[in-house]
Amino acid sequence: MEMQEFVANFANQFDDTELEMFNSETRFRDLEEWSSLIGLAVLNMIAKKYDIKITPAELRSVETIEALYNLVVTKK
């Protein structure tokens, strides 16, 4: 798994936010479109694409897409 692929998969969970808004340093909860529903979609994407289970509490513990990526990598 590579960071760019993870960022793209993460960005695909959003409908209205421009792709240019997403990079490893993006503080995703600061995005206007962020919601608990998108959070669930992100958890589901990680489970399906990477076969990794991230809890809602773990998702809340990270601030950036890179931090979430690192969390996923440590669980592999």
Regions found by a protein language model. Give the residues of each.
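Phosphopantetheine-dependent thiolation modules in NRPS/PKS and related acyl-activating systems
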Residues: 1-34, 38-44, 48-76
